[in-house]
């Protein structure tokens, strides 16, 4: 990309970055002459990274950090390959991939992603939890929360609850509850300038200050939900010190029970820059801790740039834990329909404990999830299916959380054959075998359900996901 074709960057932003970066500024500016890096992260719940690399028909270049991450050419259209529909990988900016592994949740822990849409970091957290423990993924935006639900479903996350609440309401219900909390805060999006016309067009100094004010309140709510001894990751995709070091500094000034944590440094990790806060009134102790934060830059590594600060909540006396959700017993008819489906169509059914109905939808609720009554939620757990008149119909979420060994009937399609696209378009195709529900797979990886009747497989791939 030539300088003449460089995206039109706001001049006030460039002047500020030149003042802050000094000798680094020419390299930073030159990064806008380069195409954006496209990242791909393997779904380790389903496939080993190297196995994915060997299977795909296009080249993947491994990144040194984080694990399971690759560089991929946009020209290959990786989002159109059937393996993407099977949830074998997520397309994500490499900088954004650093947040979840720095938070480093362990299997069995309780984890919150407070502003989770569209799901890049939430799916990463799900992989690290290995379907053990609890993941609460929250998104207040009424449309974006469905993108989040779709991506976690495709990922095969079986231990996730998806809520659509304000941070303040969640904080009232989950005090001192989570082992780890991720807040990828809404921001001015300066790290999106190379990719997004809208981000460049909407940027203004007033936007930066407005975001910083909003972030302070959201971070306070996030902190209230972290247990003593727990770890919080605060991140943004902006370079503005007011939203990065400034938000963390203001938080530390009013939260004496939190301290910054120094992460293990990887190639391309630059320190926080508290000196950019200028005359903002920040205590010396808070300023000293800000250098432990991580800044990722488009001129020093792959990706568009990110800010990450890890904050540990100090230990204190033991507190009373929240009780798990006391689920009502399923109606007899619902139990019968579900058990009939499992007996006729599955070899290994999901565990029958912690089953719950939300309307006509049947879920398996993650262990340890407190009562969500009164909160807005999309899914309170793994969506198994829907109770309809006289029967149980399996969900897309159930299909994506199973393996071929779990079901009685499988229709396996070749990723290079036209039949897989026929299925993804929602069309029927010839398929010999016993009648009934069939798990449709691509090269052995689940894509969704089909129903076979007299040698014809009717696609039950969800209408909203179908190829056009």
Segments (PLM) and residue ranges:
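Mobile active-site "lid"/loop adjacent to the S-adenosyl-L-methionine
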Residues: 143, 180-220, 233, 237-244, ...
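Polybasic, low-complexity RNA-engagement segments
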Residues: 1-20, 26-53, 302-307, 312-468
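S-adenosyl-L-methionine
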Residues: 138-176
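Class I S-adenosyl-L-methionine
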Residues: 178, 231-234, 239-363, 368
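Helix-to-beta-strand junctions that scaffold the AdoMet/dcAdoMet cofactor pocket
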Residues: 129-130, 226-228
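Conserved class I S-adenosyl-L-methionine
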Residues: 108-117
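A short acidic, Gly/Pro-enriched loop at the edge of an enzyme's catalytic core
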Residues: 106-107, 169-184
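Conserved SAM-binding loop of SAM-dependent methyltransferases across substrates and taxa
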Residues: 118-131
């Amino acid at each position: 990309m030539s300088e003449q074709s460089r995206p039109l960057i706001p001049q006030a932003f460039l002047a500020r970055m030149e003042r802050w970066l000094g000798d680094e500024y020419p390299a930073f500016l030159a990064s806008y002459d380069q195409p954006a890096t496209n990242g791909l992260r393997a779904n380790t719940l389903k496939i080993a990274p190297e196995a994915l690399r060997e299977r795909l028909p296009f080249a993947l270049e491994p990144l040194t950090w984080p694990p399971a991450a690759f560089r991929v050419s946009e020209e290959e259209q990786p989002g159109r390959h059937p393996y993407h529909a099977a949830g074998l990988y997520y397309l994500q900016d490499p900088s954004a991939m650093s947040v979840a592994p720095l938070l480093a949740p362990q299997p069995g822990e309780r984890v919150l992603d407070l502003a989770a849409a569209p799901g890049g970091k939430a799916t990463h957290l799900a992989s690290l939890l290995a379907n053990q423990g609890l993941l609460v993924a929250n998104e207040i935006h009424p449309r974006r929360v469905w993108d989040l639900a779709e991506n976690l479903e495709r990922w095969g996350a079986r231990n996730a609850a998806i809520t659509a609440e304000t941070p303040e309401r969640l904080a009232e219900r989950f005090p001192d509850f989570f082992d780890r909390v991720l807040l990828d805060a809404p921001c001015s999006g300066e790290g999106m300038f190379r990719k997004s016309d809208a981000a460049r067009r909407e940027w203004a100094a007033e936007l930066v200050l407005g975001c910083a004010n909003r972030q302070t309140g959201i971070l306070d709510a996030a902190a209230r939900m972290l247990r003593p001894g727990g770890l919080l990751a605060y991140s943004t995709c902006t370079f503005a010190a007011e939203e990065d070091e400034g938000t963390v500094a203001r938080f530390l000034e009013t939260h004496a029970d939190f301290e910054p944590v120094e992460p293990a440094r990887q190639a391309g990790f630059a320190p926080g820059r508290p000196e950019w806060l200028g005359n903002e009134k920040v205590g010396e102790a808070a300023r000293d801790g800000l250098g432990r934060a991580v800044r990722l830059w488009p001129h020093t590594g792959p990706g568009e740039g990110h800010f990450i600060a890890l904050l540990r909540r100090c230990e204190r006396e033991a507190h009373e834990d929240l009780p798990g959700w006391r689920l009502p017993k399923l109606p007899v008819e619902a139990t019968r329909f579900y058990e009939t489906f499992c007996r006729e169509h599955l070899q290994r059914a999901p565990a029958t404990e912690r089953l719950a109905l939300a309307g006509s939808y049947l879920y398996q609720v993650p262990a340890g999830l407190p009562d969500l009554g009164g909160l807005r939620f999309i899914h309170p757990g793994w969506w198994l299916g829907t109770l309809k008149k006289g029967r149980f119909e399996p969900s897309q979420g159930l299909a994506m959380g199973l393996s071929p060994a779990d079901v009685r009937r499988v229709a396996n399609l070749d990723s290079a054959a036209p039949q897989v696209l026929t299925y993804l378009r929602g069309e029927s195709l010839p398929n010999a075998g016993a009648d009934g529900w069939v798990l449709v797979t691509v090269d052995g990886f689940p894509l969704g359900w089909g129903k076979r009747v007299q040698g014809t497989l009717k696609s039950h791939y969800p209408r909203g996901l179908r190829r056009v």
